[in-house]
Amino acid sequence: MRLSQYFMPTLRENPAEAEVISHKLLLRAGFIRKSASGVYTYLPLAQRVLKKIMQIIREEMDRQGGQELMLPILQPAELWLETGRWHVYGPELFKLKDRHNRDFCLGPTHEEIITDLVRREVRSYKELPLLLYQIQNKYRDEKRPRFGLMRGREFIMKDLYSFDRDEEGLEISYRKMYEAYTNVFTRCGLKFRAVEADAGAIGGSTTHEFMVLANSGEAVVVYCPDDNCGYAANLEKAETKFTPEVIGTPAEIQKVATPNVKTVDEVAEFLKVEKKQILKSVLFKADDGYVLAVVRGDREVNEVKVKNQVDCLVLELASPQEVEEVLGAEYGSIGPVGVNIPVIADLEVKHVLNAVTGANETGYHLTGVNPERDFSPAVKYADIRLVEEGEPCPKCGKALVFARGIEVGQIFKLKDKYSRKMGAFYLDENGQQKPIIMGCYGIGVTRTMAAAVEQNHDEDGIIWPAAIAPFEVIVVPVSNKDEQQMKMAEEVYNLLLNAGFEVVIDDRDERPGVKFKDADLIGIPLRITVGKRTVSEGVYEVKIRRTREEKVFQKEELVDGLRQLLKTL
């Protein structure tokens, strides 16, 4: 491939709209262009990277017995109505009508349509297990698309679905996919962690997220530094070893005026108490009712854990108006004493024996609150808070460590969540009808490309891992006007091409500095410079993009030398 003929519109400056480094560099280096908010065109360089990622995925899925198919993007509403997700999924679901006024959606995920396929085709236990996957575009109407390919409205995903006779079979399929995902991201040259996670809108029981570690990541990865322990979870799922801490001694409950005192910090200062003695209350709207979540003042409520305890379809923070209507006071003055709605309190709350909490009257708080004495007997105690860095690991007790990560894949044990709702059954050896047990497994292909850039870059541009780089080697003649340099550049270009390398030659009529900057910007792992030294001494200077090291090879050493270098990159 010749850069003089290659469609690679690079930019000299960072685009103003780009917020994260992958967005900036993929735009600058000519990989992507914005077509609409959250919608991008993948230019030739990006397409080469995406094809490599997809090829790695296909090889690992096929290795585990996966069979590739292609499901429709356009999905009929009836299937989503069967599972109840047509209304639950929310405004992120792209909905449309055809000319006959029939409802459809653009698939953000494909559980319904693949379950429909399997329920119509699979009848017997002899046809199971089954692993079916696809790689194609998905659609999600994000309210605020941002961060380039990280959160778009159109994106490429691989999703595989497993169909088994029972949970033992599902466990085998799940472990196969866990292994396959580990292989995929390892082969892509990425540093990552598999972490326990919450199932979210897809549902199911056990689930793991695969997180590429990067300082710019939106997600927080919580893990134990002891490799022998191996505990890791995302922040929403993470737990800590619970050790009760008794705070205060029982006292009489009293109502005290706290004018214009609303936050935990303000209450602590006004009443001269520690934050952990204060009880923080948060009102949520859950489906058709309300629930009050209570944690210590030095902790934060974990909305995902609350939702799982309530077992509702939709959980959202109550508005200030709803807080006043339900509890009769403003935020900052609400609390769990004397309320007639469900209360879920964190496990630590029970051990605060002399607590401060809102009095459900604006401008007043209660002191001397004892949960065992003053809360409703119906209060539910559960782990509903976010863990903090340094707290003990729930498995081994060592201090938990936080890191930032980018979710690039997730695997779920769906069990019979969809098969029962949609009537996907099979007949076992005894002729008895049983639900097919399912799992689903997704990889964000475009997100993986962006995450690779977030993890692998410097001030000069992208540093692609060799396995997913658009090209492995770029040949740069210093002067297009020097016939001998051009001749030797062409010779080495053809040599590498014939040896099976993915190589490009920069034959553009540009200054050497421009060529070198572009090579660094687009992130090709190895750059061969053909200059005066090449002509005079017959040697080729090879620069390693990742380390900036330079090595010198004779022509006859070049093929083996480059192969060895690429193995390390």
Swiss-Prot record:
One Pfam family, short name: tRNA_edit
Protein name: Proline--tRNA ligase
GO MF entries: aminoacyl-tRNA deacylase activity; ATP binding; catalytic activity, acting on a protein; proline-tRNA ligase activity; transferase activity
GO cellular component, one term: cytosol
Localization terms from the record: Cytoplasm
Upper classification of the organism: Bacteria, Bacillati, Bacillota, Clostridia, Thermoanaerobacterales
Quaternary structure and partners: Homodimer.
Catalytic activity: tRNA(Pro) + L-proline + ATP = L-prolyl-tRNA(Pro) + AMP + diphosphate
